[in-house]
Design a protein with these regions (language model features):
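Post-Walker A alpha-helix
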Residues: 20-21
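C-terminal accessory "lid"/substrate-recognition subdomains
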Residues: 178-203
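A glycine- and Lys/Arg-enriched "phosphate-lid" helix/loop adjacent to the NTP-binding pocket
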Residues: 40-45, 68, 91-96, 103, ...
Length: 203
């Protein structure tokens, strides 16, 4: 059985990352979205093990000590982490996993799982990104801060395997889907023991 692919997507705020991930999951039945752990309280409509694994802080800290996270961070006094066992079991079963995460988290996971695939999504221009952020009706100082953060994030794009420009949503989704197909066909991801009888007859 071919191994699953861990696909990590990063993008500046307002680039359409969430929409792209949702479209990918609708299109690719061989792809599963990674469920993260958090210590924050569930929001209305959120379900344990579907949207997040909701944990107490003490339990989360014990998991940190046991090395059960591929990466973790504290955001607004709440802990967030990517569970190692959830992803490793899916990949072993031949299921690819999609993970949307920031550049720091992506770098941390790449160090632990160098075979993961990193895809960075950018807007076509900074002006188009400004327009998207402004359309959200954020305060002007918030837009300026997000744009500054976006420039810093895009400087890290050189550390990724693929760069996708989200000028057209369907095109961007198709390009990422093609990347997943190609990566899944790599010889390094195949079970060569299982294929040995077939390969033995290849001249």
């Amino acid at each position: 059985m071919p191994k699953g692919v861990l696909v990590i997507i990063s993008a500046p705020s307002g680039t359409g990352k969430s929409t792209i991930c949702r479209k990918l999951l609708q299109r690719r039945k061989d792809l599963r979205y990674s469920t993260s752990c958090t210590t924050r309280a569930p929001r209305p409509g959120e379900k344990h093990a579907k949207h997040y694994f909701f944990l107490g802080k003490d339990e989360f800290k014990r998991k940190i000590q046991r090395g059960e996270f591929l990466e973790w961070a504290v955001v607004h006094d709440n802990y967030y982490g990517t569970p190692r066992s959830y992803i490793e079991s899916a990949l072993k079963a031949g299921t690819s996993v999609l993970l949307a995460i920031d550049i720091q988290g992506a770098a941390a996971i790449r160090r632990k799982m160098p075979e993961s695939i990193l895809i960075f999504i950018t807007p076509p221009t900074m002006e188009s990104l400004r327009e998207r952020l402004t359309a959200r009706k954020d305060a002007s100082e918030s837009v300026a801060k997000r744009l500054a953060n976006s420039r810093a994030e895009m400087a890290a794009a050189k550390n990724y395997d693929y760069l996708v420009v989200n000028d057209d949503l369907e095109t961007a989704v198709s390009e990422i889907s093609c990347i997943l197909t190609a990566e899944g066909l790599k010889v390094s991801r195949q079970d060569l023991v299982e294929l040995a009888p077939v390969l033995a007859h290849v001249n």
